[in-house]
Amino acid sequence: MGTTEATLRMENVDVRDEWQDEDLPRPLPEDTGEDHLGGTVEDSSSPPSTLNLSGAHRKRKTLVAPEINISLDQSEGSLLSDDFLDTPDDLDINVDDIETPDETDSLEFLGNGNELEWEDDTPVATAKNMPGDSADLFGDGSGEDGSAANGRLWRTVIIGEQEHRIDLHMIRPYMKVVTHGGYYGEGLNAIIVFAACFLPDSSSPDYHYIMENLFLYVISSLELLVAEDYMIVYLNGATPRRRMPGIGWLKKCYHMIDRRLRKNLKSLIIVHPSWFIRTVLAISRPFISVKFISKIQYVHSLEELEQLIPMEHVQLPACVLQYEEQRLRAKRESARPPQPEFLLPRSEEKPETVEEEDRAAEVTEDQETSMS
């Protein structure tokens, strides 16, 4: 009796959940005419033989995925619509909390590449100071064993809104031509020392090429060293004629200097001026402004220079110091009174006087004898 009532109750239940006993979906019992208990509808009055009423089977529900419109527009259901842009709270990123790299972190990857360019595909290991390798500061690739790479180190500078490249390998022996001599007065008034004795010899085979790159190096160094007003100390002493810069080179330097640098130049001190440098400046007057000519000052000794500027940080070449010492020695010798070349001792003067008196006495006696 109990089994019959349970069967009647189950007939009144509309079960639309699908049993997930198989991988593929199957039609519902009402569509095929089969009962949900495994028998046909006509055989529903018979008691079930396979249904376990004591235990409950766990049923799984089929989740149907929503229809997705795979398109690039932002219409409803599209991948780009706002319905699919919701993200959990733990995925929200605060931009202010993101750490950005500072200048020191970025420079670790740049190295010297921000201003140096390599030619002929030089390997990176030869350009950087790797641990255990010898330092190659000028990019000539020479190491401790004397070997050299094919590449050269170049520096790119901008002068007068134009980009130029400097061959640092060629001007390496002449880089001491421009040095920083400290500051004078109040503020950042720089002292730029130009030592002409470090200029290349005009008899060099690559003289014009070296002077061209050295000129760019001097101009770019001025722009880096000068912040406010400045003065140039031109050390002309101990410079042979073959190392003197030509008029064309000086003229080019003057015209390539930025207007700000020409305006901020307060004085051009020429130490140990020679007749040649005076002649060059006299010939250059037509293309040099009167204001620039008025800034030129001649100094004939280092002692006089010390009275004009502080000398604590001025690096004087050894040849200039030697030239100054020779000039001081020659000046002291010229200041001494002239001395006679031959001096007779007084002991020898007395016998000569006696002999002259004896001769005079003999002549007098002869005259008296003849008169008698």
From Swiss-Prot:
Q: What is this protein called?
A: Caytaxin
Entry comment on modification after translation? Cleaved by CASP3 and CASP7. The potential C-terminal product released by CASP3 cleavage may inhibit the ERK signaling pathway through MAP2K2. May be ubiquitinated by STUB1.
Give start-end positions of Polar residues composition bias.
42-53
Q: How does it assemble?
A: Interacts with KLC1; may link mitochondria to KLC1 and regulate mitochondria localization into neuron projections. Interacts with GLS; the interaction is direct and may control GLS localization, negatively regulating its activity. Interacts with PIN1; upon NGF stimulation. The interaction with PIN1 (via WW domain) and GLS is competitive.
Map out region (Disordered) in residue numbers: 1-58, 125-144, 330-372
**Implicated disorder:** Defects in Atcay are the cause of primary generalized dystonia. The dt (SD-dt:JFL) rat is a spontaneous mutant that develops a dystonic motor syndrome by P12. Dystonic rats exhibit both axial and appendicular dystonia that progresses in severity with increasing postnatal age. There are no gross differences between normal and dt rats in terms of brain morphology.
List the top taxonomic levels of the source.
Eukaryota, Metazoa, Chordata, Craniata, Vertebrata
What are the CRAL-TRIO domain coordinates in residue numbering? 171-328
Question: What is the stated purpose of this protein?
Answer: Functions in the development of neural tissues, particularly the postnatal maturation of the cerebellar cortex. May play a role in neurotransmission through regulation of glutaminase/GLS, an enzyme responsible for the production in neurons of the glutamate neurotransmitter. Alternatively, may regulate the localization of mitochondria within axons and dendrites.
**Does this UniProt record's set of keywords contain Secreted?**
no
Sequence segments annotated as region (Mediates interaction with GLS) = 190-372
Task: According to the UniProt record, list the residues that bear Phosphoserine.
Answer: S54
Provide the domain comment: The CRAL-TRIO domain is known to bind small hydrophobic molecules.
Q: What is its main location?
A: other
The gene that this protein is the product of is Atcay
Q: Which PROSITE patterns match?
A: CRAL_TRIO
Q: Where in the cell is it found?
A: Cell projection, Axon; Cell projection, Dendrite; Presynapse; Mitochondrion
Q: Which GO terms describe its cellular component?
A: axon; cytoplasm; dendrite; growth cone; mitochondrial membrane; neuron projection; neuron projection terminus; perinuclear region of cytoplasm
Tell me the segments the record calls region Required for interaction with KLC1: 115-120
Q: Where is this site: Cleavage?
A: D105, S106
Please indicate which superkingdom the organism of origin belongs to: Eukaryota
Which GO BP terms, alphabetically? apoptotic process; mitochondrion distribution; negative regulation of glutamate metabolic process; neuron projection development; regulation of protein localization
Keyword vocabulary terms for this entry = Cell projection, Cytoplasm, Mitochondrion, Neurogenesis, Phosphoprotein, Synapse, Transport, Ubl conjugation
